[in-house]
């Protein structure tokens, strides 16, 4: 089980990203638009740099929904390999069958 503080920190980053995503996208569009004047693009770069780091999508870590484990997660299930195996062996994951050949 991961520390509650690290799980909460990641949730806070997700919230910040959700709130600032539109503004970040607008600024990035201005920065990438070569038809805009250089001064306007530079001003957009400065505004983007002033935004909180935690509002960036790259700061978000995929974590297991049950345990909070940060490594070896399956995106589709939002579970770590350990939690997925445990739930799968109990028959709680639809369509998941134990491999045998």
Swiss-Prot record:
Residues 1-10 have a biased composition (Basic and acidic residues). Keywords: Ribonucleoprotein, Ribosomal protein, RNA-binding, rRNA-binding. The keyword Transferase does not apply. Residues 11-23 have a biased composition (Basic residues). It holds the Pfam family Ribosomal_S14. GO terms for biological process: translation. Residues 1-23 are annotated as: Disordered. One of its GO terms (cellular component) is small ribosomal subunit. It comes from the Bacteria. GO terms for molecular function: rRNA binding; structural constituent of ribosome. Belongs to the universal ribosomal protein uS14 family. Binds 16S rRNA, required for the assembly of 30S particles and may also be responsible for determining the conformation of the 16S rRNA at the A site. Part of the 30S ribosomal subunit. Contacts proteins S3 and S10. This is Small ribosomal subunit protein uS14. It comes from Nitrobacter winogradskyi (strain ATCC 25391 / DSM 10237 / CIP 104748 / NCIMB 11846 / Nb-255). The lineage of its organism: Bacteria, Pseudomonadati, Pseudomonadota, Alphaproteobacteria, Hyphomicrobiales.
């Amino acid at each position: 089980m991961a520390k509650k503080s690290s799980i909460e920190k990641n949730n806070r980053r997700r919230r910040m990203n959700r709130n600032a995503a539109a503004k970040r996208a607008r600024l990035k569009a201005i920065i990438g638009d070569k038809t805009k004047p250089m001064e306007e693009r530079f001003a957009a770069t400065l505004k983007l740099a002033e935004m909180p780091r935690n509002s960036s999508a790259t700061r978000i870590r995929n974590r297991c929904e049950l345990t909070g484990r940060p490594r070896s997660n399956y995106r589709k299930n939002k579970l770590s390999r350990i939690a997925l195996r445990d739930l799968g062996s109990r028959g709680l994951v639809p369509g998941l069958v134990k491999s045998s050949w």
